[in-house]
Amino acid sequence: MKKLVLFLGVLMILMFTGCGGKKEAADTGEKKLKVGMVLSTGGLGDKSFNDSAYAGLVRAKEDYNIEFNYVEPASISEFGQFLDDYAAAGYDLVVAIGFNMESPLKEVAPNYPDTKFAVVDAVVDEPNVTSILFNSKEGSFMVGAVAGMMTKTDTIGYIGGIDMSFLNEFRDGYVAGAEYVNPNIEVRSLYVGGSNPFNDPAKAKELSLALKNNDADIIYGVAGGSGLGLLEAVSENEDLYAIGVDSDQDGAVEGKVLTSMMKRVDNSLYTITGELVEGKLENGVRMFGIKEGGISTSEFKFTKDLIGEEKLAKIKAIEEKIISGEVVVK
């Protein structure tokens, strides 16, 4: 059963005075723009890219006075219908979250040439689609360097949702970053798989413990809502640490998430919504990396003392080298 939540914008009625002031859409009688978002499976509460996407559009709703609606599909098979529902209802922008949206959007977008679509983590080559990509390999390189510096066993782990090229970009960047600072590092990789790889915390916890039993003391989880199982595992094991992904997960288990590879889905969706409001949103591929402010590590709020000033300075130096081009993550 689809869960559809409508956020009604607040109608601001401004009185004309000699002082003037900021004009809202209500002043001119303009119709509010409507933005609908189809989340990936796992939905809200994943402490990952769904939550980040939601935060960005809530901010856009408040700042741009738009109407915002979202839906949380129970399965991938529902994606196409929900995209179609929003387009048929006359939404100005329909946002699709996740690489699994590629095929459904390719089918739906051509049927609604006057509707703008945006897709995160996929490329759909249609004249009415904006494809939002992130240089996740750069961010994963950064957190891999953190893991390579902090491991006490020279063995770290990676848990992916499924074994496929898109997610392996995260793994490859993580491995490269760890090897950049620690040539003796070993990286062990496992995958959730199954019928619901991005919303199976129990399986991810099982894999986390398996990696721990094979000497991994730091694990990077790239599996959406399944990553909650990794967080549970580190909360129960004193000598096991996690690295978060997509959003700032550091506070989920304070002091046990060394850092998070933040894919700023929130910033990207806020940006394109502003362009929509201004009539400047264009189709094509948009790439957000560290230099563009689309990728970053979290602020080490709970782990600064654990990591120490010397290592934090080295991490900052690596980031600056990526921005300058001295270090190129391939």
What label would you give each PLM region?
Residues 1-5:
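Positively charged n-region of N-terminal signal peptides that target proteins for export
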Residues 7-13:
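Core hydrophobic alpha-helical membrane-spanning segments
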Residues 15-18:
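C-terminal motif of bacterial Sec signal peptides marking the signal peptidase cleavage site
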Residues 22-330:
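A residue-level marker of the well-folded mature domains of exported/periplasmic proteins
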